[in-house]
Amino acid sequence: VTLTAILFGGLAGVASLVLHWPVPILSGSLVTLVSIFAGGLIGALLGGVWIRRSKYGVERRLLEDYARWLVSEETVLILQGPIETLRFPVAVLRESGDIPPAVFVLHPKRENPIGDVRSPGVPLSPAQIQEHAQRLAMDHEVDPRPRRNAELLRRVENAHQWIHQVCLDLSEASRLEQGAPPTAEWILDNEFVIESNARDVRLNLPRRFYQELPALANEPYRGLPRIYGLAKALVSSAELRVDRENILAFIEAYQSVRTLTIGELWAVPQMLRIALIESIQDLAASALTELREHEIADFWANRLITANRRDPKQLFSILAELAATQPGPSPYFATQLVDHLYDEDAALVPVQSWLERIYRKSLSELNLREQNRQTKDQISIGNAFTSLRQLALLDWRRIFEQLSRVEGLLRFDPSGVYSKMDFDTRDRYRRAIEELARRSGQPEDQVARRAIELATQATREATGDDRRIHVGTYLMGEGRRELARLIPCHEAPRFRVLQWVYRHHSAVYFLGLSFFSAVFISLIVLPGLRGQTPGIRLVIALLLLIPVSQLALEVLNYLVMRLLPPRALPKMDFKVSGIPDAFRTLVVVPVFLGNAETIRAEVEKLEIRYLANKEGNLLFSLFTDYTDSDQAHREDDERLLQTATESLEALNHRYGGERFFLFHRDRTWSASEQKFIGWERKRGKIEELNRLIDGTRPEDADRLVYVGNPDHLSNVRFVITLDSDTQLPLGTARRMIETLAHPLNQPRFDAAGRILAGSYTIIQPRVSPTLPSTSGSLFSRLFADAVGIDPYTKAVSDVNQDLAGEGSYHGKGIYDVRAFSRVLSGRFPEEWLLSHDLIEGAHVR
């Protein structure tokens, strides 16, 4: 007020001098003083009004109310402002004087934005929960119209923000040393649990997926996802305690009447999180209300005690004011007020009479009921936070597959392959069923039945193609068109476009490369050659064609990776059962016998590969050659071979059995090299090994096998070939075997002996450099990235797989021995191939 008075007075004085200049000094001074006084008075009045009406003033209603509630010779100091600004003045007041004043802090009233969303149901027994689920299934009506809004997702975010604000109020009350309800401690200590679960909902329940969930057409959850209604019912009937057992029991009981979709089952954990967060929001609202009622009870108890002690005549007028301001006091307020008046009989008796008239119950009965409610709230909020933690620990993959009706149908796959596949492959099969069901309007379980029927029919037809009796052929393979016609179903435009691109991948790729090359030449080269003759333009354009085409290649590869989905291959799962005998695999590392130290280092690396890939049907070997020489035999050859033999035999002795093999061959004369070398170098090693395994040249066993039993090689199905510097990380060998062992990946041949598209003889995983090697040279630092180095096509080798379904082979991978030999045995002339990897990959796929 003073500041505004000075401001307005100064402005009035300056205005007076300006308006009356020039004037006599005496009269001008008098006018100026009068103007300053009048301006100051106006400023003071305006400042007072502004303070009263602004956030810095105390509301007149508060002044009038508290003036009525004071007793004689009593002073009150009212501070009105944000709750976080009161900590310092409250501390000062509590430390002032020998007898500090009574201090009361009243928090603002916050309304729950979505009201009370807790269902009024009572806890049910397990049998009652299942009956409740069945009744819900009969009552639920699904809205056939698609839902376009995301109201529930907004509610979750608002609930999270609102609970955070409540936590700020509760923590501020704790700093002000105010009494808080018992549930407040749970909320403050576990706010991070709410935050993490709300974040989980945002990440795992995207808007598009949410809008695909079936919605309810009847109340009380009209327009909301059906699975949300189930989650609310389960949370309510289980008293906010959700675990694996009651989730399974509730949903299985519901599905005994009405089947849930695959998407709904995947949304179960997120909907349970939403239901629990909303229940915690209600409990937080109750805690905040109880905090405010506790503060109000403190104040009115102080008023009654003060009136009783200092002016008993005002006791009943204060009580009348209390009854007027609290016409319907809550049981919590009543118990808190009575607790404060416990030793004040004169004040307690009328208050007790007033409360008993309102509730028509005795105070002891009211107090008992309130204690039971508080105990129930503590149990509920403890259950809610425990359930949120439990949801994060559950294996939802196993729960989903246990609940899914589609999963149960697919496990009747006539080939028996489906149940032996890994989870990601089974999930891709189920997503295919979702897509077909969505496009056809048929239930998902009906689509699954049709796929099983086609596979079963193929078993009766005895076509000789094992793929036809596998349900995956009709979901992911060439039989999908047949299934789509049977349903019937019109595939999505995106799916049809992708299939067309896959069938014409070469044309798409080269047309795209030509298009971008032409665009870049026209945009970059031609504008700078204006005024030149056509011949000069043509020459310069041809000279720049290679660098421009490289730029076009990078752009095209980027677009392919961004626009086409990854083409992951289906896989089996041998993690628990181990590699079957039918897929016994040999790991072979071709090396040279250079010196003893090198040999011991190679044996040690082979041992490391074994320790990282301990499997029953996985064998490990070195295939060695002597170094090139002008002589067929050198004097140190026998010593080096003996070192290798003893080292491999030591491994067999250390780990038991005959798991480690040593293959070796002598030098032969090479006319092209004019030296004695190992026949055809690495390609020759692989070819001789294949002949030994497939039985074409069994007599080679005595010549090639130096460590290990050759009889154990006859049942080898696959070979994993590695370079000396290639590691085999933990479990990698098994994952490669699982991929090549899947029926949809196993090699198939046409009548001419050529391998068919969609089947593979070689599976090559991504090859990445180790962390130390990425900084070993300038080249590595420039070209190594998050996906590593590809020796032939740099960092874009996945473009070939995503577009054409096959990649460039560079000598490290797993192959089917007999299919490999069938295609390549005797195909290449001797001493013609320097690098054999690419040409082998081109022939065998």
PLM regions and their residue ranges:
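Cytosol/matrix-facing juxtamembrane amphipathic
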Residues: 1, 37, 41, 45-113
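Select subsegments of transmembrane alpha-helices in polytopic membrane proteins
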Residues: 2-9, 157, 506-517
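Membrane-interfacial hairpin junctions
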Residues: 13-34, 527-536
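Transmembrane alpha-helices and immediately adjacent membrane-cytoplasm interface residues
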Residues: 35-57, 543-565
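ATP-dependent phospho-/nucleotidyl transfer catalytic cores
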Residues: 117-224, 249, 274, 298-306, ...
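Active-site activation/catalytic loop segments of kinase-like enzymes and analogous catalytic loops
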Residues: 196, 223-265, 272-289
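Alpha-helical bilayer-embedded segments of polytopic membrane proteins, i.e.
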Residues: 273-283, 495-557, 765-769, 809
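Internal catalytic domains of large membrane-associated glycosyltransferases
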Residues: 309-499, 567-845
